[in-house]
Amino acid sequence: MNKISHGQELFLSRLRRHRLIVRFARVLILALFLILWEVCADTGIIDSFIFSSPSKIALCFREMVTDRSIFLHIGVTLYETIVSFLLVTLFSILLAVLLWCSRKLSEILEPYLVVLNSLPKSALAPLLIVWLGATPTTIIVAGMSVAIFGSIMNLYTSFTTVDREKIKLIYTLHGTRRHALFKVVLPSSVPAVISNMKVNIGLCLVGVVIGEFLAARNGLGYLIIYSSQVFKMDWLIMSIVLLCIMAMGLYAVIGVVEKIYQKRF
């Protein structure tokens, strides 16, 4: 039976206390911000029509939950984000592997990937609408366009920086490039893939919202544009808050996947 020393117990106690303080401080800052916002709106320090207030936003959310319209908008945005994220993850891994397998191809395509990654993706959205029409497919492609080029470059860089000695060992044992890929490169790059996924989930959400601004009839992005046009600031700020919560939730899911991987491997 393992026994924990006094020093270890003291360290764990301090660690738990530190985490508790951090969580309490986070909640306190948020609570103070909401209270200050509500007080300023009620006393007229800020214009409640323009800036709304937490109570108005909560009331607006309750009304949309009652008529269930908010679930449609959340579901549409969540579906498009997850699909675009999964496609980005799949295609970026496949293309990064292809570039790693062919040095000549990587040298040919590298400048194009750099240029495409540097393009402002919001400028591509109108072009995608013309090409694909105002459909959910267009929004999914818009979400992919924000993340995929940078993801390919990051994964390819990760593949090329794997320990060369391990790859040489594979070849010394008469292994092939395929063996090096599946025995060394991909297993060594799993942390980089997960790290990339954490970034991509947020980027895909941004791309989906940009697409919904221009080519949607449902979704939180559409709700933001519509509410800004009719000056319903309660709807607008509520939609932004829901997007923040969605982003945090999706990021947390990837974090859980990372912890499961770390515990198993």
PLM features: what roles do these ranges have?
Residues 1-29, 252-265:
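Transmembrane alpha-helical segments of polytopic membrane transport and secretion proteins
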Residues 67-101:
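Transmembrane alpha-helix signature in integral membrane proteins
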Residues 72-80, 122, 130-151, 194, ...:
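Loop-to-helix entry region at the N-terminal start of transmembrane alpha-helices
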Residues 94-129, 153-160, 168:
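Cytoplasmic-entry segments and transmembrane alpha-helices of multi-pass inner-membrane transporters
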Residues 103, 195, 237-265:
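C-terminal transmembrane helix and the adjacent membrane-cytosol boundary/short C-terminal tail
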Residues 119, 159-165, 169-189, 229:
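Short helix-to-coil transition segments within interhelical loops
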Residues 130-131, 206-243, 262-265:
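Glycine-rich helix-loop "coupling/hinge" segments at transmembrane-helix boundaries
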Residues 141-145, 178-211:
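Transmembrane alpha-helices
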